[in-house]
């Protein structure tokens, strides 16, 4: 593999976590491992993941639609702040103005999803909050699974450590565009997320 110029992407065992303890009461786990949806904007998942290179770190916040696995919105920042999470949700909410949908928004128990700003955004837009059970990673497995595949596919044959922060940001953005529009999935009948939504949504 070395002769062919192929570099193995080694996933780091330590995973970024925004959990800072039970800062406020958690809402019920409505999703409860059911990551299916019968229509677009019925059920959303959200999470933040860390991407590190030699020049520093970037944090990717996403909202993923359970109907077709599409990344509805995303934001990239140099810090995992509440603003990063809120801006991601605000961007997704803008797309609801063309519909009557009021999705469930499911997250882990991280601090970003328990601050007043996040709660106000969900309440003001009549979204239904759902949170994973304490210490139960599988409760948001669909979102975490996306990040795992992304870190493998996005940096296949490339070393993330060698990228600058600007290059890393471009890689992340380009991957999401490719994933939404071109990455076919067996679970979607050989269609990409956008193709599936346009045909069946």
Segments (PLM) and residue ranges:
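Active-site beta-loop-alpha junctions of metal-dependent nucleic acid enzymes
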Residues: 52, 75-98
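Basic, flexible linker segments flanking DNA-binding modules
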Residues: 1-39, 136, 192-200
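Mobile genetic element proteins and their domesticated derivatives, centered on retroelements
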Residues: 1, 31, 47, 63, ...
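Hydrophobic (often cysteine-bearing) scaffold residues that line and stabilize catalytic clefts
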Residues: 27, 41, 60, 81, ...
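RNase H-like two-metal-ion nuclease catalytic core shared by retroviral integrases
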Residues: 17-20, 107-109, 115-116, 132-151, ...
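C-terminal domain-tail junction helix/linker
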Residues: 123-125, 151-201
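An active-site-proximal beta-strand-loop segment
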Residues: 33-72
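Short small-residue beta-strand/loop micro-motif enriched in glycine and branched aliphatics
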Residues: 70-74, 129-132, 155-158
């Amino acid at each position: 593999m070395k002769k062919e110029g192929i570099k193995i992407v080694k996933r780091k065992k330590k995973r970024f976590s925004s959990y800072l303890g039970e800062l406020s009461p958690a809402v019920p786990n409505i999703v409860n491992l059911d990551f299916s949806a019968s229509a677009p904007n019925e059920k959303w998942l959200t999470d933040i993941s860390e991407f590190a290179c030699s020049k520093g770190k970037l944090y990717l916040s996403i909202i993923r639609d359970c109907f077709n696995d599409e990344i509805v919105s995303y934001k990239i920042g140099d810090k995992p702040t509440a603003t990063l999470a809120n801006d991601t949700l605000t961007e997704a909410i803008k797309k609801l103005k063309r519909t009557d949908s009021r999705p469930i928004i499911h997250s882990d128990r991280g601090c970003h999803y328990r601050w007043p700003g996040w709660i106000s955004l969900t309440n003001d837009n009549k979204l239904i909050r759902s949170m994973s059970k304490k210490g139960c990673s599988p409760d948001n497995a669909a979102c975490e699974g996306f990040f795992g595949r992304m870190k493998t596919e996005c940096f296949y044959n490339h070393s993330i450590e060698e990228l600058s922060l600007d290059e890393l940001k471009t890689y992340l953005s380009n991957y999401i565009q490719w994933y939404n529009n071109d990455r076919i999935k067996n679970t979607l009948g050989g269609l990409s997320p956008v193709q599936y939504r346009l045909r069946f949504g």
